[in-house]
Curated annotation (Swiss-Prot):
Residues 18-30, 121-136 have a biased composition (Basic and acidic residues). The modification Phosphoserine is found at residues 96, 98. It comes from Schizosaccharomyces pombe (strain 972 / ATCC 24843) (Fission yeast). One of its GO terms (biological process) is positive regulation of RNA polymerase II transcription preinitiation complex assembly. Residues 1-30, 92-136 are annotated as: Disordered. General coactivator that functions cooperatively with TAFs and mediates functional interactions between upstream activators and the general transcriptional machinery. Binds single-stranded DNA. It is found in: Nucleus. One of its GO terms (molecular function) is transcription coactivator activity. This is Putative RNA polymerase II transcriptional coactivator. Keywords: Activator, DNA-binding, Nucleus, Phosphoprotein, Transcription, Transcription regulation. Pfam families: PC4. One of its GO terms (cellular component) is transcription regulator complex.
Amino acid sequence: MAGKRVIASGDKASSKKPKTEKQSDHELHWALNETEKKRITLSEFRGTRYVHIREYYEKDGDMLPGKKGIALNINEWKKLKQLIHEVDDSLGLVDSGSDSEDEIKEKAENNASLKNDEDDLNTKTENKTDDSSVEN
């Protein structure tokens, strides 16, 4: 009977997968929506820390992680954070800390004015240099 499992009388073969450990209460998590079904969770597995972005479901009063989601190691998380600004720009989103349209226009006008002043100064300096070379 090689390769077959022998079941003693009274024993039942279990077709269920072994239960996984419930999410511990000390893991940090942040809800992405009002129902808390989408979360960012920090965890550690085999000595490696992960940031999970995952959908959860409720079963028997407990919120359990679902299949939909992704686990990022620390390097992947850092890269995602670097890309967020580019994604925001592509979506046309404005950061709340950024300047308003009026402030941007004012800065552009000031920069243009400074550029004109700089050009005028350079022109005057060139004219003085030309005048001094004529005198010699």
